[in-house]
Amino acid sequence: LHFDGMYEGSLFYGTRFDDSLSVDKLYREGVITENDITDVDKYVKEKLSYILHGDINHYDGLKRIRNKEIAKRMGLKNTPYFQTTENGLISQYRMSSGECLLISLLHFIYNALIRRSLPVDKPILMLIDEIELALHPVAVSRLIDLINSIMEEHENLVVYLSSHSPE
């Protein structure tokens, strides 16, 4: 069984850690340069900022590897994001677990649904396990609001969420 647009963003194993050590090493050794990095899409920056902090500008310094081809050339499976700090860049893998997972989820949503890389005439199934994991309850509520608004705009989208939270 094949699903287009499959993304697994596990917290403890799986794709999240495939690139973690590689990205740190590539950045530390100067392999990842300013030419390889660009500002993130406004959608991802603003949604991440709002969901986690209640404003749309908190992650103004968020960057990402320019494209999949550059990431693949570096041996990376994903397109990592970076936050600008006084001391340089911090990869999403060194940010909080909630930030890291939400960046990956928003990247997927933006590319698959907003930019429409997935077909609009076929059903899209999105499964999000333990949506509350590593997120503040207010952030979970804001994320669910975003998912609801996306579902209203995309009739072919079905989303299933799981939670172990009593809230």
Whereabouts are the PLM-identified features?
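N-terminal/domain-start segments enriched in small and hydrophobic, helix-friendly residues
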Residues: 5, 9, 40, 160
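Extreme N-terminal leader/anchor segments
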Residues: 1-16
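Extended helical coiled-coil dimerization/tether regions that scaffold
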Residues: 17-100, 107-117
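Switch/communication elements of ASCE P-loop NTPase nucleotide-binding domains
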Residues: 93-167
